[in-house]
Amino acid sequence: MTSTFHPANGSFEFLDSTGYNRIPIVSWLKSNAQEGLGHAHKAGELVTLLGGHPSLKIGALLETEKHDIGDILRESLEHENGALAAYYDLLKISEGNSVLLEEFAREMLVQEELHLDEVNKMLRRPGEIEPFKE
């Protein structure tokens, strides 16, 4: 995989998704997608437990129509931040009302923070230890 660092704006651009890192990156993305489906299933079960009916609608998709790895990872970072905020909201609402929902929110927060960390590390320039910032 080739990449370019743009010192003027501090951005790091991945130019393609081929080469030595293609298979691990594709595998990682597939694994995250499968995990996301598992999260959706758990959430649906909780909605049903609470007497509701899970929606089959899909929310807004964060598609930029750009398909290099850097763009995909930045989209993933945005998605992880949104999920993290939603789970913090759920935790705040459920605290003192439902131990089950509190624990679900905490479990999801741990997983989302770990995902956020993984994506952040992948977006850093080689050798960079500071967190990625756009």
Q: Which stretches of residues belong to each language-model region?
A:
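Iron-associated oxidoreductase/ferritin-like identity signal
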Residues: 1-134
